[in-house]
């Protein structure tokens, strides 16, 4: 994975509560095993009309949000069934950062595991950001090292992140690469394990 340290991009607002993983990536698109190519299916039922044309009433179809890489989402984002395809779809769509008052726990972890940064903010701080960026084409900067969000006017908001996940993102580690870093320790442990554990 690519390291994520500082990111600047357009922020799009999807102010809907309880957006579940089936709304993020509908089940009919889960048959593929590749991690790429899901972006065109993200929010499919909201994003397109029955005839396949873009839905002009869907928030993320607004021209102001073209090229957005930061998503300001509503409460309990990513709830519902556990499907890793949800962060795959969001990442392939172009989102690197998701900011919300709350996330479903499994979805929250899956974002980190797939190189995305989910940021929980207190409701009032989140609400202020959502109101600023709604229907606007404005950028913000997220600094993971300093754990700050800097809005388009230069105002900063601090956020918390688990040190383990922070290290993973800063270094571009996934679970496999992190395990490989511990290869020597794992081999030492296997050599020292009790004989009754050996076949």
UniProtKB/Swiss-Prot annotation:
Protein name, UniProt field: 3-isopropylmalate dehydratase small subunit
Source organism, top-level taxon: Bacteria
Record organism: Bacillus licheniformis (strain ATCC 14580 / DSM 13 / JCM 2505 / CCUG 7422 / NBRC 12200 / NCIMB 9375 / NCTC 10341 / NRRL NRS-1264 / Gibson 46)
Keyword 4Fe-4S attributed: no
Enzyme Commission number: 4.2.1.33
GO MF, one annotated term: 3-isopropylmalate dehydratase activity
Enzyme class: lyase
Subunit note: Heterodimer of LeuC and LeuD.
Annotated gene: leuD
GO biological process: L-leucine biosynthetic process
């Amino acid at each position: 994975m690519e390291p994520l340290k500082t990111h600047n991009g357009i922020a799009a607002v999807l102010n809907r509560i309880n957006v579940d993983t089936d709304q993020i990536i509908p089940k009919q698109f889960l048959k593929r095993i590749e991690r790429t190519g899901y972006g065109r299916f993200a929010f499919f039922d909201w994003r397109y009309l029955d005839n396949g044309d873009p839905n002009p009433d869907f928030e993320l179809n607004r021209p102001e949000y073209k090229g957005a890489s930061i998503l300001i989402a509503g409460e309990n984002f990513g709830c519902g069934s556990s499907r890793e395809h949800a962060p795959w779809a969001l990442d392939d769509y172009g989102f690197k950062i998701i900011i919300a008052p709350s996330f479903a726990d499994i979805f929250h972890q899956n974002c980190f595991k797939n190189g995305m940064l989910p940021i929980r903010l207190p409701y009032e701080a989140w609400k202020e950001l959502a109101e600023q960026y709604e229907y606007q084409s404005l950028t913000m900067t997220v600094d993971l090292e300093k754990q700050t969000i800097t809005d388009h006017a230069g105002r900063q908001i601090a956020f918390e992140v688990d040190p383990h996940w922070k290290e993973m993102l800063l270094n571009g580690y996934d679970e496999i690469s992190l395990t490989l870093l511990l290869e020597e320790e794992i081999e030492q442990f296997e050599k020292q394990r009790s004989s009754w554990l050996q076949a």
